[in-house]
């Protein structure tokens, strides 16, 4: 939300704080919560999601085919391997459908320029806490032990 950009993200890490600062209506949240991820971690398998979602399967198959890197067709295979063969550590595939729905809401919101502008202005007004100046001063003082 820095510089008025609206955030789309999962409800973890800094996005929790951003959501608290800007308000539920001014951020686009998708995906599993940290608690839901933890509950599913022991038996999560990305393959059923891949096989059940034609849009996701089409996207991953296109990436894996070399379509986006004809000069080096295997260039992006490690991405697909990480998501499928290596277990999708960050639950990216589990969040895909929710992300798609959030992106549709975001796109509709963008078409309503008055609503988009209002949300952008509110984000700017409520994001002061996240300024890089404040963050770097805190890092200098608390982590690096240097004057700021």
Model-derived segments and their meaning:
Residues 1-129, 134, 138-148:
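Catalytic binding pocket for nucleotide-activated donors in carbohydrate/polymer assembly enzymes
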């Amino acid at each position: 939300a820095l510089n008025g950009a609206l955030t789309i993200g999962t409800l973890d890490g800094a996005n929790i704080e951003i959501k608290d600062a800007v308000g539920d209506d001014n951020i686009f949240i998708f995906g599993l919560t940290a608690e839901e991820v933890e509950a599913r971690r022991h038996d999560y398998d990305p393959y059923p999601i891949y096989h059940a979602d034609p849009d996701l399967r089409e996207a991953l198959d296109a990436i894996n085919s070399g379509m986006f890197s004809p000069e080096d067709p295997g260039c992006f295979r490690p991405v697909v391997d990480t998501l499928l063969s290596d277990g999708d550590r960050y639950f990216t595939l589990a969040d895909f459908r929710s992300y798609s729905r959030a992106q549709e809401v975001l796109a509709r919101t963008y078409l309503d320029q008055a609503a988009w502008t209002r949300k952008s202005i509110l984000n700017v007004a409520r994001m002061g806490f996240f300024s890089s100046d404040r963050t770097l001063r805190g890092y200098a003082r608390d982590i690096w032990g240097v004057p700021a």
